Amino acid sequence: MPAAGSNEPDGVLSYQRPDEEAVVDQGGTSTILNIHYEKEELEGHRTLYVGVRMPLGRQSHRHHRTHGQKHRRRGRGKGASQGEEGLEALAHDTPSQRVQFILGTEEDEEHVPHELFTELDEICMKEGEDAEWKETARWLKFEEDVEDGGERWSKPYVATLSLHSLFELRSCLINGTVLLDMHANSIEEISDLILDQQELSSDLNDSMRVKVREALLKKHHHQNEKKRNNLIPIVRSFAEVGKKQSDPHLMDKHGQTVSPQSVPTTNLEVKNGVNCEHSPVDLSKVDLHFMKKIPTGAEASNVLVGEVDILDRPIVAFVRLSPAVLLSGLTEVPIPTRFLFILLGPVGKGQQYHEIGRSMATIMTDEIFHDVAYKAKERDDLLAGIDEFLDQVTVLPPGEWDPSIRIEPPKNVPSQEKRKMPGVPNGNVCHIEQEPHGGHSGPELQRTGRLFGGLVLDIKRKAPWYWSDYRDALSLQCLASFLFLYCACMSPVITFGGLLGEATEGRISAIESLFGASMTGIAYSLFAGQALTILGSTGPVLVFEKILFKFCKDYALSYLSLRACIGLWTAFLCIVLVATDASSLVCYITRFTEEAFASLICIIFIYEAIEKLIHLAETYPIHMHSQLDHLSLYYCRCTLPENPNNHTLQYWKDHNIVTAEVHWANLTVSECQEMHGEFMGSACGHHGPYTPDVLFWSCILFFTTFILSSTLKTFKTSRYFPTRVRSMVSDFAVFLTIFTMVIIDFLIGVPSPKLQVPSVFKPTRDDRGWIINPIGPNPWWTVIAAIIPALLCTILIFMDQQITAVIINRKEHKLKKGCGYHLDLLMVAIMLGVCSIMGLPWFVAATVLSITHVNSLKLESECSAPGEQPKFLGIREQRVTGLMIFVLMGCSVFMTAILKFIPMPVLYGVFLYMGVSSLQGIQFFDRLKLFGMPAKHQPDFIYLRHVPLRKVHLFTLIQLTCLVLLWVIKASPAAIVFPMMVLALVFVRKVMDLCFSKRELSWLDDLMPESKKKKLDDAKKKAKEEEEAEKMLEIGGDKFPLESRKLLSSPGKNISCRCDPSEINISDEMPKTTVWKALSMNSGNAKEKSLFN
């Protein structure tokens, strides 16, 4: 961004073009930039010629000729006479159109754009020492400067440039030497070729040439060398040590590890895979930590500026090497150099040269100019790139901005694709149709029309990735995810088993729940389509089990046998759904339904975590109004009940207890509760004596676990410690929290409630085994009647499984190995049937656990430029974490001695963390925060730019109403119909098409699939529009090939349609400015001076 507030230098630079007469720009710069494309060139643009190899340039170094010399332009002019009218229009193309034409050329091997690292070096002279090139700034994406003290790099920041320095840079390229596709192997050869071109115009005599050559070949001193040259490093920061430890090992060509200490000088295999044996690299001078941030295959762009006392006018050269060459000692990091920009001038204008160098380096980091620099064939192409850059910059008012302020790099850099798109006749840019949100319309959800067709395609899609699902798990991140989720999964499984045991009088309890979860999870992780999904128990299943058990008890039926029949019918119906590709209906589940369902599950997790903590007050009561002076008078003793109930009397009778012989006052709390005694005294609560400290200590454990987990998870973005340490702490955040809290709880010694794990592997009740007879003592007709509740169960399983699968498989997660909706449902169905036969609980996809699993396996770019936010790359897709979670869960019976130390409040804190963290990224909660927020304070959400705020609020209110209804049903005795209500959300969303336009819904939600008839109508309408557009093009007489039309929107032809006075051509308007006229006049004076000398 040019900062208009910068002060203009005392004088403007004068340049002389060395390879021909000085070009004096008197306001007609557009004529210099006229690109006379011949008809044959336009017709051949974007055309692939097979089997024809064209030379990229001359092989001789001595006869290397700059692009844009007189005879070339004459040739162009001769060709132009054949198509005068078309080329006259082309002469007035905007820089944007010219750049689009340049970028449309076919790429060859030598002109494929690479990532660029740009370094700015300036000549530095110290008293009593020889001059040397000193690194003063560098760019990988953002600018970093060597601070004034010379001891450290600045923080990366967005470069702000003065408009004057950009004009001077443009003048440099017009009047300086431009050498494209130079073949050279060393800085000496490059210097000679540049000076040869300068001598052609008699600008340099022999003595000046020698001095300039000496200046170009001076030693380069880089900032990282200063630390390494210190002979006595007394203090080394922990961060620097961490950098060394976290650097990747460098490998020599034999695969052996190379360290800077062991091999001071060796041939380094550069990151683009080229090994330059003639350019040895001293590893001791390489900043290995910074090298890690350089992308693989990157090339260097070196900007050399400085003052030389013998010169009376600047020497400017822009060089593109072909191929790129590793120039030893020139660049801070050992990567091949592709571009060089050299500016040497008289003494007294060092700051001016510095700003021009910054402008050159900054413009090389621009995505569009970067590509133009690689594909340019002549000087005019580079000028078009600069003009296009100037056409896009933003100017800051001088009175409202301080140029010394450093702008922080943005979190998200906007895409530059629109700058590459061709224009349309009205002068606007053709916008790419964006996909605001990811839908579910991929090939995985298309009906095949064949029996089990979708399942077969799922297997074919997932089979090639199967072994990679195990290889990709070789990462510490997977270990952290596994340890965290094992602890997170254990507690709900055991809690669910305990609740089920209470509801079924011990027929299915904790040990059955552990065994069922382990067996189902292992099978699912091994063979499911989407192994990132974590299976768990759900609330509606528990409600169903309670209702079924009560029904069986009322009608004297065998609960486990009837349950087995229902489970087998449910499994069969699910397999029927797989066979008929019913999972394709998932495409009707849009973001509206997903977010309502996911939000409800997250809120339930948060609510139940807090509810369980509050419930501890009943087990561990406290005396809220204690009088400290009466502490010695408080007591609580066990006594004989005054009015024992029938249950108590029967217990005493069964155990032969004679109440008169029992010393009730001497019994412990557990003994008193076991013998059905009563507690009496001023320190007694409803269920026993007041318990000191336990409830408050549990609260401390609960909230500390949540806060510490959240803090450690965000530690990755903190400013402390090296990157690898921060990443490891972030990955292991929850496990470290649990471990820390267990140690603290053990050391404090307060008897907090602990995780209770069954210690013996056998059924809870002795009157049942591991295999259940589906008929058993029940009448035969119960087998057929079981299909009725099985239908409801099937809807429950299908909705829970597929909504969770849809959330996991969203396009935002960038999954690369495909989905497997049909295969997932098949595995759930098979294991549901197995669990029914064995009398084990049913397990289906658990939404919050699955979201947490995915979030713990997020991948971010490791090689990010300084100041650039790491990019989200996707999810580490593998099967091992899920497999290990459930394998270890099955072994938990043998780990009771360890697991008994885990306090339950810590696990409740983990539930709270999982619920809160899963809410992040749910758009519904972002929209909910907009209520009551003034418009000026609202975040810049993309949908707020395209949808009126009242429509956003209406959409949110409808979603909130549905969420409240779901909550009410979930908490009521009618919770068994909860899946039906989730299904009803799909119909609610369909009705919303009447209240919102298609465009509004595309930003707020996913578009629902339309009917077949509507699709056919839209296809016919689109075909008709294309046909009319073709007719209009034919009437317009557009003779360009189709590909050229798409790329250029017909260069030159657009101009004939351009009648909007607001449209300008920056190349035409720039020469009219006073600044440019001053530069041109100075250039003219320089020419006259050179002629008369």
From Swiss-Prot:
Subcellular location: Apical cell membrane; Basolateral cell membrane; Cytoplasmic vesicle, Secretory vesicle, Synaptic vesicle membrane
Any single GO BP term: regulation of intracellular pH
Signal peptide region: none
InterPro entries: Band3_cytoplasmic_dom, HCO3_transpt-like_TM_dom, HCO3_transpt_euk, Na/HCO3_transpt, PTrfase/Anion_transptr
Cytoplasmic compartment segments: 500-523, 587-595, 709-731, 800-824, 903-904, 984-1093
Gene (UniProt): SLC4A8
GO cellular component: apical plasma membrane; asymmetric synapse; axon terminus; basolateral plasma membrane; dendrite; glial cell projection; glutamatergic synapse; hippocampal mossy fiber
Positions annotated as glycosylated: N646
Membrane topology qualifier: Multi-pass membrane protein
Protein name: Electroneutral sodium bicarbonate exchanger 1
Gene Ontology MF terms: bicarbonate transmembrane transporter activity; chloride transmembrane transporter activity; identical protein binding; sodium ion transmembrane transporter activity; sodium,bicarbonate:chloride antiporter activity; sodium:bicarbonate symporter activity; solute:inorganic anion antiporter activity; zinc ion binding
Coiled coil: 1010-1036
Residue numbers on the Extracellular membrane side: 1-478, 545-565, 617-687, 753-778, 846-881, 926-962
Tissue: Expressed in the pyramidal cells of the hippocampus (at protein level). Highly expressed in all major regions of the brain, spinal column and in testis, and moderate levels in trachea, thyroid and medulla region of kidney. Low expression levels observed in pancreas and kidney cortex.
S-S bridge residues: C636-C684, C638-C672
Protein's job: Mediates electroneutral sodium- and carbonate-dependent chloride-HCO3(-) exchange with a Na(+):HCO3(-) stoichiometry of 2:1. Plays a major role in pH regulation in neurons. Mediates sodium reabsorption in the renal cortical collecting ducts.
Biased composition (Basic residues): 59-77
Organism listed in the record: Homo sapiens (Human)
Gene3D superfamilies: Helical hairpin bin, Mannitol-specific EII, Chain A
Lineage, highest ranks first: Eukaryota, Metazoa, Chordata, Craniata, Vertebrata
